């Protein structure tokens, strides 16, 4: 299009997988942690889109090119080999994505001005103001009173998949100089922070760990994110502490910036027998443009290891889940280089 200055591709796919091989978790009493088995069938649907454009083509010495790529994938588990509709021990449910979490859904903290606070003793026996409030899915009587306490049946299927993801890159050149910028983005989905999860360190608000500086609930700070220290405990953590580990995984980051200069047709190069010389300076992962997770924690939101690859995580996170936090983060690297052609 536009005399070759605009081009692109679009691909749509449907992929069906049978006899899917996965690691199946076993109870600790079995003596074996897991085994490999064909667990069922999955289906992936999605698209991949690319658009390349030349905005300036040697206009007064200026060249400007840009490229956009976009992709989206929808995964679902269509069948379990056992014939059942779910395997809750392994977080497998027919219909949702195979990599989904099965956990309580945090809706806030309990406060005295909450309409349900009058039912706190029913929903959370022994509970207190300032503790984590999770979604209740049970029945209520005619007056709106809950019929039972919150329990395992209130856990939700939480999809970790993004709505879409992709990248944008651009190149600007002028009289031997060139600047390349590569960015990546992700919209929607959830990431799991091992620092904030139930096996992390930022929600253990007991003992000496109560000295961690987080935004926790007090009578003067009822809009806090973290619960009141000293409430109902689940091990070393506040009850429902795992819900603090889920974050919006959206981000837009600069992945690479490279500035270079090409020494061409230089007499001193010819005398040295050098046909061409290029010098460049590059930086990887220089900064995050926007990210809810980065704004709160200062960490890079790009997940880079699975639960079973993270030595700081011993339980509570499925091995196939991408995590960020106590693993090795994306690093910022600076590189200077010279390319010579003789």
Regions found by a protein language model. Name each.
Residues 1-31, 64, 71, 75:
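Membrane-embedded beta-barrel scaffold of Gram-negative outer-membrane proteins
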Residues 3-4, 16, 51-59, 64-66, ...:
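Outer-membrane beta-barrel proteins
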Residues 8-14, 66-72, 172, 181-185, ...:
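Transmembrane beta-barrel strands of outer-membrane/channel proteins
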Residues 12-18, 32-33, 41-47, 70-76, ...:
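Transmembrane beta-barrel architecture of outer-membrane proteins
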Residues 37, 43, 56-160, 200, ...:
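Conserved small-residue
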Residues 39-46, 90-115, 216-222, 239, ...:
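C-terminal beta-signal and terminal closure region of outer-membrane beta-barrel proteins
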Residues 45-51, 64-66, 164-170, 177, ...:
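Hydrophobic, lipid-facing positions within transmembrane beta-strands of outer-membrane proteins
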Residues 186-278, 282-284:
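Extracytoplasmic gating/loop element in the C-terminal half of outer-membrane beta-barrel translocons
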